[in-house]
Amino acid sequence: READAAKLARNRDAIFDLHAGALAWMERSTGIPYPFGKFDLVLIPAFQFGGMEHPGAVLYKEASLMLDASATEADRLARAELIAHETSHMWFGDLVTMRWFDDVWMKEVFAGFMAAKITEPAFPGVDHRLRFLADTYPRAYRVDRGPGANAIRQPLADLDEAGSLYGPI
């Protein structure tokens, strides 16, 4: 759908290479071949999330993957982490799925951890451990020590409310 041919040309190879690398890393690390018959990428201009996985397909907000010419190294790293996160959900979230969204933390924790590991080789100049700590811990501690803290396991009666279970912890 991207109408800017230069933008498409500038991003296309990186998007496919990052997905291929994430898939290969997950197969090597888990010892489990990619579990679905296809792997589709769908870029949606006005999607409310950066990305959302489904068995065999990932939906992305178009702007999350199609970077401008002025994109920084941090922008490219954020794109790589998003791709790695959503790709890892093919194993942790789709192949292995919690019984119900009460335990949504399980798939998100694994996907976040795997994303950090997957992106490390592509960005050797980044201190990934420090970045993971600096990005994750302050947000989690801010929520966890205050009155807005949620239990790890959160009962969910209505699937329409599932979005309320996602947060910094």
Give short role names for the model-derived ranges.
Residues 2-169:
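Hydrophobic alpha-helical and helix-loop surface patches within well-folded domains
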